Amino acid sequence: MNNEICEITCIHEDKVNRAKSKLANFDTPSVSGFFKILSDENRLKIVHALVHEDELCVCDIANIIDASVATTSHHLNSLKKLGVVDSHKDGKLVYYFIKNIKILNLMELGVNFKEEVLA
């Protein structure tokens, strides 16, 4: 016998309707897209590096994540569209920095979750 699933089908309509009502007001595609972009290891490495270094040029970031400048630029563009990072040009160099420091809270939450729950 599988203890992970119900042995009979029993729908609790009041609970289901409340959950569906709340879900209707929840922007699932945007939140899912946000986590999808952050689910890439290289993007997490980029965010982690920028949290600790304030700003880095694309060449430095490429070296840190051991990727080409083109691949790194693609990752940075995704993070920029998401509003996590921003950039400024200084001569011939483009520097990236964390735009919204709340991303640090999210990363800390992820680390704490892993340590407490997944350990």
From Swiss-Prot:
SMART domains: HTH_ARSR. CDD domains: HTH_ARSR. GO terms for biological process: response to cadmium ion. It comes from the Bacteria. Residues 23-118 form the HTH arsR-type domain. GO terms for molecular function: DNA binding; DNA-binding transcription factor activity; metal ion binding. PROSITE patterns: HTH_ARSR_1, HTH_ARSR_2. Cd(2+) binds at C6, C10, C57, C59. The keyword Transcription regulation applies. Residues 58-77 bind DNA. Keywords: Cadmium, Cadmium resistance, DNA-binding, Metal-binding, Plasmid, Transcription, Transcription regulation. Homodimer. Metal-binding repressor for the cad operon. Involved in resistance to heavy metals, such as cadmium, bismuth, zinc or lead. Metal binding causes the repressor to dissociate from the DNA. This is Cadmium resistance transcriptional regulatory protein CadC. It comes from Listeria innocua serovar 6a (strain ATCC BAA-680 / CLIP 11262). The gene is cadC.
